[in-house]
């Protein structure tokens, strides 16, 4: 199902992370880039304080090198690469503010949203000149032209997805594992859509996340930080844009969406009633506080991601 170049992209990106991470972890520890754990988080997370973060830099390096190796043959890889790089830069600045400047919450929410919308609108404005404004709706089995609404709708979906991936990065191996599965499905869809460039970029995501899991699975030796989660979120949705498949990505990334919605519901319900729907949001923390082991929550969420991908596959076949 995967072509030779995509398999090579997976292997190359995987090996880069495996080779670089053993050097990066002690270097991040030397720079005192330790994770700051919030006091209101689950008690079991307090022991994670000081674990090196910003490991997403290695994920990004892996994707960057792999993409550049294939760029001459597949120049359209440059579009999602630049978009992912821009979102990764926001994440890096956010991590820098939290870890180095010791401001625990990082950039202000308003600052991040403005920057994210600026990147999204710029990216969409450029690519729509080449791709047009039509997107594929799987359930309808046809393309729909969004016309003037293309940039407003797609930019909101992009920013929402990027932040949803960021919110999912709260347990050891959760975001990296879910993104590995999503990336693999996107690679397969890209091949069937005859988009080898997007298959290779998706493969780079798969390989880098696979390599990162070696060090991020419970108990994690390193976290990706916002550097990694925002970059991966931007990468995933930019592939969706290039494939004209934003709806499909919202389905296969259903776990991201559920995590984000759990936070939105928690905040809105608390403001209205001063009560909470969940013990804690995002949703993965709710299950932790119900007594589930962290590793169990992660594996169950991986399984649900696979189910979402199978649902998407069934919809495509209808």
Swiss-Prot record:
EC number, UniProt record: 2.7.8.13
Broad class of enzyme this protein falls into: transferase
Keyword set, alphabetical order: Cell cycle, Cell division, Cell membrane, Cell shape, Cell wall biogenesis/degradation, Magnesium, Membrane, Metal-binding, Peptidoglycan synthesis, Transferase, Transmembrane, Transmembrane helix
Localisation per UniProt entry: Cell membrane
Domain of life (superkingdom): Bacteria
GO terms, molecular function: metal ion binding; phospho-N-acetylmuramoyl-pentapeptide-transferase activity; UDP-N-acetylmuramoyl-L-alanyl-D-glutamyl-meso-2,6-diaminopimelyl-D-alanyl-D-alanine:undecaprenyl-phosphate transferase activity
CDD domains: GT_MraY
GO terms (BP aspect): cell division; cell wall organization; peptidoglycan biosynthetic process; regulation of cell shape
Catalytic activity: UDP-N-acetyl-alpha-D-muramoyl-L-alanyl-gamma-D-glutamyl-meso-2,6-diaminopimeloyl-D-alanyl-D-alanine + di-trans,octa-cis-undecaprenyl phosphate = di-trans,octa-cis-undecaprenyl diphospho-N-acetyl-alpha-D-muramoyl-L-alanyl-D-glutamyl-meso-2,6-diaminopimeloyl-D-alanyl-D-alanine + UMP
HAMAP family, per database record: MraY (MF_00038)
UniProt xrefs under NCBIfam families: mraY
Function according to Swiss-Prot or TrEMBL: Catalyzes the initial step of the lipid cycle reactions in the biosynthesis of the cell wall peptidoglycan: transfers peptidoglycan precursor phospho-MurNAc-pentapeptide from UDP-MurNAc-pentapeptide onto the lipid carrier undecaprenyl phosphate, yielding undecaprenyl-pyrophosphoryl-MurNAc-pentapeptide, known as lipid I.
Protein family membership: Belongs to the glycosyltransferase 4 family. MraY subfamily.
Protein name: Phospho-N-acetylmuramoyl-pentapeptide-transferase
Species of provenance: Caldicellulosiruptor saccharolyticus (strain ATCC 43494 / DSM 8903 / Tp8T 6331)
